[in-house]
UniProtKB/Swiss-Prot annotation:
InterPro entries: ATP_syn_F0_a_bact/chloroplast, ATP_synth_F0_asu, ATP_synth_F0_asu_AS, F0_ATP_A_sf
Pfam families from the UniProt entry: ATP-synt_A
Organism of provenance: Chara vulgaris
Location in the cell: Plastid, Chloroplast thylakoid membrane
Protein name: ATP synthase subunit a, chloroplastic
Main location as per UniProt: plastid
The protein's assembly and partners: F-type ATPases have 2 components, CF(1) - the catalytic core - and CF(0) - the membrane proton channel. CF(1) has five subunits: alpha(3), beta(3), gamma(1), delta(1), epsilon(1). CF(0) has four main subunits: a, b, b' and c.
Superkingdom of origin organism: Eukaryota
HAMAP family in alphabetical order: ATP_synth_a_bact (MF_01393)
Length: 246
């Protein structure tokens, strides 16, 4: 009985070392911002811009391996946007959907592939930007602004007529839907990335390093899927806002 209590206390101590919600704040005027989220976001943006710049230098008619990779990514984003928004309207939205997908994809993977834990901060620790609810909410709200803008740009004020279609009785439900879209986008992404990092952190604290490796690979796969889901839904919402209802 004593041994069981000792093991339980040991496990509780190790798991308790995995802290959630610790933040380093920067004061900008009267506001406080999460410093580690800004730092890791800048790292992710720098990686995307740097790799894109290097891969697009010295473009050739017969593409190199790096050029092939960039062209494949661009074609993938183009096809994704085209399938959700439509043949006639998709081109202006390729940069937006592509930026969303690449930022979320690299952010998700950075939590597993970049040794953020080696960087010591006065408070908190560095982690994937999408591990913070503020980042995912900002991305979701940006998506909401995008599909409202798309609908108003194409249809004008008649865009709001969708709220009373097919019957005015559905007005409250249709309005509520516009609030649930960003909520579902933000909490789905945040929950999956946070849960993945917590599971790996707990396993590393309990068992040797080799055991959590399969979970890390599974986390990389689910992180890529979450980036794809977010980009697909963002494109689908934009396509829904500009489609003609009869």
């Amino acid at each position: 009985m004593y041994n069981l209590c000792y093991i339980q206390n040991l496990l509780e101590y190790q798991i308790a070392a995995v802290e959630v919600g610790q933040h380093l704040y920067w004061e900008i005027g009267n506001f406080e911002v999460h410093a580690q989220v800004l730092i890791t976001s800048w790292i992710v943006i720098g990686l995307i811009l740097g790799l894109t710049f290097l891969a697009t230098q010295n473009l050739q008619f017969i593409p190199t391996q790096n050029q092939n990779l960039i062209e494949y990514i661009l074609e993938f984003i183009r096809d994704l946007t085209k399938s959700q928004i439509g043949e006639s309207e998709y081109r202006p939205w390729i940069p937006f959907i592509g930026t969303m997908f690449l930022f979320i994809f690299v952010s998700n993977w950075s939590g597993a592939l970049i040794p953020f834990k080696l960087v010591q901060l006065p408070n908190g620790e560095l982690a994937a930007p999408t591990n913070d609810i503020n980042t995912t909410v900002a991305l979701a709200l940006l998506t909401s602004v995008a599909y409202f803008y798309a609908g108003l740009r194409k249809k004008g004020l008649s865009y709001f007529g969708k709220y009373i279609k097919p019957t005015p009785i559905l007005l409250p439900i249709n309005i509520l839907e516009d609030f649930t879209k960003p909520l579902s986008l933000s909490f789905r992404l945040f929950g999956n990335i946070l849960a993945d990092e917590l599971v790996v952190a707990v396993l590393v604290s309990l068992v040797p390093l080799v055991v959590p490796i399969p979970m890390m690979f599974l986390g990389l796969f689910t992180s890529a899927i979450q980036a794809l889901i977010f980009a697909t839904l963002a494109a689908a919402y934009i396509g829904e806002s500009i489609e003609d209802h009869h």
